[in-house]
């Protein structure tokens, strides 16, 4: 049964950098949405002390929600093996965090697209690191889900495996059972490629999804690509309300349903306010009901 989660995209700096919002405040706010769970980010200030993990889990479950997904951003493509080992160690900590919170999916990435790292080396570095983490994740009941990613909020370079061919080669290279794809259609558009073509290539490996829509405030995709090497997201890029951007959710959900997708869809939206996030929830609920059946049109938490 597909379920709907939300990610605190609009509140990342408040929760990760400034500490001007507590995790409990986000949980209580998100609980007013018609969703089934929450996706957390590993950099949340309130999660850095493992003694606070039970508190975060209880606060979420008290609202009738779960924390199925953890958004982690390991950087596995650095040429220094010591750096990569440090990233593996961090990923294992995040896997422990995921399991302690009751989650079953912890994101992995390839890493940053550093100009000095070749395609072959980057794929090898990332694959080795992910395969090193996979048995540890399995011991904790966690599946590693790699996202076709654009860029972490706090990275300098864009994702090494941003382009479809590189991403698919990396996914194909990794054969461990507790590994799959976290599909994000918007990120494919940012790579100048077709999200439906990517979905067709990886649909049998998709275990979770990031629901988002993107628009360019000004300029073109080509202009955006010129700005990739600045820290954070390019300023001309905008997360929009889902259903009002460039993604065809009827085609996306139809494809996912055709392969028996039965997992979590996490909303990455709301940067223009909480009402925008509410609108995205309403849109996705309508589409879930349309494609999977009327029972998926609500979480029933507020019944």
What are these regions (language model features)?
Residues 39, 69-71, 107, 145, ...:
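Conserved beta-strand positions in the central sheet of alpha/beta enzyme cores
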Residues 1-34, 161-303:
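Histidine-acidic metal/acid-base catalytic patches
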Residues 49-50, 79-80, 117-118, 156, ...:
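Short Asp/Glu-rich motifs
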Residues 139-175:
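Basic- and aromatic-lined ligand-binding clefts that recognize polyanionic substrates
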Residues 10-12, 42-44, 73-76, 110-114, ...:
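Active-site-proximal loop/turn and secondary-structure-junction residues that shape catalytic pockets
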Residues 1-103, 121, 127-131, 138, ...:
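N-terminal pre-domain/capping segments
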Residues 98-119, 140-153, 266-267:
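Active-site groove signature of glycoside hydrolases
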Residues 80-81, 112-123, 150-159, 239:
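Surface-exposed cleft-lining segments at the edges of enzyme active sites
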